[in-house]
């Protein structure tokens, strides 16, 4: 039987590759190589990820905190919501701005995407997992705040575009957080949950 190989660098969307969505630490006889139907599902999910990437990178600061933002500079009177210019008075020192939006096009890192049935079993997934059909990804998050922010953005995208998703699961194991996001071609359940695993 001829061994089938997968082009790891094949782009599903401008910022996501097939290799990135099929990577696994498990070595299996099937090579975790997706079918054409699975690739179509991965492309659908990656479309949402592209939108998340853009919105996470350019989202304006929340209006809720407009009047209570911390100063962007230590020892300087800086108007809330106004980003300082590159030329700064010498008596002002930069301080981290916890309310600042990330740079445009924030990288979205995928921990897990497609899993063949064998890889899914080794990973401890349930047989009916959306990962097996290529409909789900686990998005790496730097912490709870980023996980909640990504979830809120995905909910906004769903509401604003009138599209649905199947699962939006905010998951945590110890101090490690990730966001499980799934979109099916039909019969999406819009299941939202916080899970400690």
Language model features with spans:
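Extended, low-complexity, intrinsically disordered C-terminal regulatory tails
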Residues: 47-55, 104-124
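Catalytic cores and adjacent binding grooves of peptidoglycan-active enzymes
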Residues: 128, 133-136, 141-197
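Extracytoplasmic cell-surface/polysaccharide-interacting catalytic and binding patches
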Residues: 1-55, 100-103, 190-197
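Amphipathic alpha-helical interface surfaces
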Residues: 41, 45-48, 119, 135, ...
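Short glycine-rich, low-complexity/disordered patches
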Residues: 55-56, 64-65, 76, 102-108, ...
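Long, intrinsically disordered low-complexity tandem-repeat segments
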Residues: 57-88
């Amino acid at each position: 039987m001829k061994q089938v190989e997968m082009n790891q660098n094949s782009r599903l969307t401008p910022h996501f590759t097939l290799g990135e969505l099929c990577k696994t630490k498990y070595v299996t006889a099937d090579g975790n190589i997706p079918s054409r139907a699975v690739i179509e599902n991965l492309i659908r999910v990656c479309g949402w990820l592209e939108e998340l990437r853009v919105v996470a990178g350019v989202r304006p600061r929340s209006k809720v905190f407009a009047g209570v933002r911390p100063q962007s500079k230590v020892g300087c009177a800086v108007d809330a919501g106004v980003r300082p210019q590159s030329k700064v008075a010498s008596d002002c020192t930069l301080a981290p701005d916890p309310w600042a939006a990330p740079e445009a096009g924030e990288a979205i890192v995928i921990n897990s995407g497609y899993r063949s049935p064998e890889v899914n079993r080794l990973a401890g997934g349930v047989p009916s997992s959306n990962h097996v059909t290529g409909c789900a990804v686990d998005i790496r998050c730097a912490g709870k705040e980023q996980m909640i922010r990504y979830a809120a953005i995905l909910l906004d995208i769903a509401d604003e575009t009138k599209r649905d998703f199947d699962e939006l699961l905010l998951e945590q194991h110890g101090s490690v957080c990730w966001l499980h996001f799934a979109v099916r071609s039909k019969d999406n359940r819009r299941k939202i949950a916080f899970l400690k695993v």
